[in-house]
Amino acid sequence: MFFTVRNLSNRTSQVVNYAYIQYRLLSSTTKTKGLPRLIKAIQGSSKDQLADDHLHMIDDHRYGEDSWFVSSTPKAETMGVADGVGGWRRLGIDSGLFAQELMTNCSEFAEQPQYDGSDPRQLLIDSFDQMKKMSGKVCGSSTACLVTLHRRDCTLHSANLGDSGFMVLRNGKVLHRSDEQLHGFNTPYQLTVAPEPGMDCILCDSPQQAVTSHINVQQGDLVLLATDGLFDNVPESMLVRHLQPLHGETRMEHLQHAVNRLVDMAKTLSLSNTFQSPFALKAKASNMNYGVGGKPDDITVILASVDVPDKD
């Protein structure tokens, strides 16, 4: 008998989903044994998805209009998230497909033998340039955040354009958090390919504008990479409190459990009408009449633990 995830109970489908993620991530890291690595766990939720429609989302690296990728080579570990801008829907354009294509290109460039993870902004530049040159081009807009681990010196490099972002935690405290890039309230910097060359496109930012950083990381550090569906709904203090017990955690199943809970938390708070969410606070600071409550949105989260093997 053939079955799909929709034939299963929600709980069973989650187990299948989590096991599938772990299989994919474990198989991507076997060739880098003995080198510094990122032990990764991934989860997400589309604001429109059915409660049990998980496996498809993982298989095509999409959660609604969000997309993601992870890559592992002997020189570098690379992770990325992209958030397609939903405003294109009124023109019949799926920005989720744009975000997915951008992440696919980033993944392919990250797998090149010469790429060592030291310049994720160039990775973003090359990937976006390739999108613009495609004959059957994919149109839309997306934010993007790339984080790479340069294995040789155990340095984390990043390139962030827009309001997705990442945090690095050490010993239960925030070591680094990326800054948002906004044109105005709820209007992030974004990469755009318009459907027509002459089409007026106000928000056509350049990948060269991505903010970069580099951080020396060590055993046990945690890296949290996510789209704004997480950061707009879960305050930093709650994220830190949730992640504090995971310092030094290298068991993938424990990281997966933690990232599952983060997504569940963000989803619950996004639907709240009473919670004072980070998005509501930003709206108030911008003199917007938003009141209180969360922001229903697609959510994509990658949680990674830095593992530096002992040198024998």
Swiss-Prot record:
Cited SUPFAM superfamilies: PP2C-like
Enzyme kind, highest EC tier: hydrolase
Keyword set, alphabetical order: Hydrolase, Magnesium, Manganese, Metal-binding, Protein phosphatase
Lineage top rank: taxon: Eukaryota
Any one Gene Ontology cellular component term annotated for this protein: mitochondrion
Record family assignment: Belongs to the PP2C family.
Organism: Drosophila mojavensis
Cofactor(s) required for function per UniProt: Mg(2+); Mn(2+)
Xref: Pfam families: SpoIIE
Record domain PPM-type phosphatase: where: 42-306
Protein name: Protein phosphatase PTC7 homolog fig
GO MF annotation, one: protein serine/threonine phosphatase activity
Residues that coordinate or bind Mn(2+) 2: D83, D228
InterPro entries given in the database record: PPM-type-like_dom_sf, PPM-type_phosphatase-like_dom, PPTC7
EC number(s) recorded for this UniProt protein: 3.1.3.16
Gene designation: fig
Residues that, per the record, bind Mn(2+) 1: D83, G84
Catalytic activity from the UniProt record: O-phospho-L-seryl-[protein] + H2O = L-seryl-[protein] + phosphate; O-phospho-L-threonyl-[protein] + H2O = L-threonyl-[protein] + phosphate
One of the protein's GO biological processes: dephosphorylation
